């Protein structure tokens, strides 16, 4: 079913993996469960005792939550397009998010150029296309757009220098 959905352009991805359903709210039930409602994520507490103690008080057993920023939503749409469809329309991202793609993602494009030289993808004026040789590495390609991974790499690089 997932293969058919990918071929038909109906494949989606969420934090749990691939799906044929787009943007579904996911409710978190159980210890350490993660839920998604709209542009927010919440994770439940991590121990069974704490989970039941909080429920017994009539509260939700949420440990932490985050609300996605406009940048998070932009990057999520790029990562999803690359991982689900193996291509990204630069123009559609610019229109949907009111950005100049090449300016906003100059650093990411520079990183992708090395992958392009390796035959994993192709970048032109309107598209980023994952080539057959890059499909098995699409996760690494998409990770270029993950701001949180980039900041972790920069922090690690800086701390190694010191």
Q: What is the role of each PLM region?
A:
Residues 1-5, 114, 136:
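Short secondary-structure transition/capping segments
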Residues 73, 77, 88, 107-110, ...:
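Short amphipathic alpha-helical segments
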Residues 100-117:
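Short amphipathic alpha-helical interaction segments
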Residues 116-126:
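A short, conserved structural fragment
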């Amino acid at each position: 079913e997932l293969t058919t959905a990918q071929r038909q352009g109906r494949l989606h991805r969420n934090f749990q993996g691939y799906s044929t359903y787009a943007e579904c709210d996911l409710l978190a039930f159980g210890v350490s469960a993660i839920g998604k409602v709209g542009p927010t994520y919440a994770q439940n507490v991590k121990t069974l005792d704490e989970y039941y103690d909080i429920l017994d008080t009539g509260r939700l057993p949420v440990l932490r939550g985050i609300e996605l920023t406009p940048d998070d939503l932009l990057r999520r749409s790029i990562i999803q397009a690359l991982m689900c469809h193996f291509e990204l329309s630069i123009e559609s991202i610019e229109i949907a998010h009111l950005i100049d793609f090449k300016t906003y993602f100059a650093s990411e494009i520079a990183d992708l150029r090395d992958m392009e030289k390796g035959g994993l993808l192709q970048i032109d004026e309107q598209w980023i296309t994952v080539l057959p040789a890059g499909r098995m590495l699409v996760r690494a390609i998409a990770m270029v757009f993950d701001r949180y991974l980039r900041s972790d790499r920069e922090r690690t690089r800086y701390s190694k220098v010191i």
